Amino acid sequence: MYPVIKRCIDVVGAGLGLVVFSPVLIGLAIMIWIQMGRPVIFKQMRPGLQGRSFFMYKFRTMTDERDENGVLLPDEMRLTRLGKFLRSSSLDELPELFNVLKGDMSLVGPRPLLMQYLQRYTPEQARRHEVKPGVTGWAQINGRNTISWEEKFALDVWYVDNCSLWLDVKILFMTAIKVFQREGISAEGAATMQEFMGYYEKQYSKLHLNDLQAAAMQDDVD
């Protein structure tokens, strides 16, 4: 029964949000266009319910600057002053309300991450896709980008198992407080969260590093 109620809340909430914030949306779009040009909206394929892909919308926060070899510069160098403000205030997320109206996302749920992460989850972590992704979620009010991927996914799965009207109301209320306080926006010393490599890739990297260290020690002995 709650999924039906949740969808009604999503439609009403996203619709009201777009109406209330329409002057902000228009104003920010103009500012981004003046500073960075087109496109104003950043569109990227993300996995949704049961891993099905959809295009997620956000306000653009970075330039497309590249080095002499045509390779994109690091995120920290491409993130503009306006982009930093949009991220710290979470205003870059406002266009996701269109995704909520379309039914790709919910107001509350695990955040939609990158498509390549689907192959890197453990079976337990993959359970985060048993519900629609959200504009905000349980992990976002419990550390956001200052906690590890493993902690974040554990919180996502906990939400899947405990989703309810009152929990969603609590998350929305706490999100408003966190946004006002600007907590947990990014990991220390980084413009964006480090890429999730997955448990098995991490284990392989550790083994590879151990092999290299062992080989180096053998060379020293020889």
Descriptions of predicted regions:
Residues 14, 42, 80-84, 116, ...:
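Positions in alpha-helical segments
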Residues 128, 138-187:
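Cytosol-/stroma-facing membrane-proximal "stalk/adaptor" domains immediately downstream
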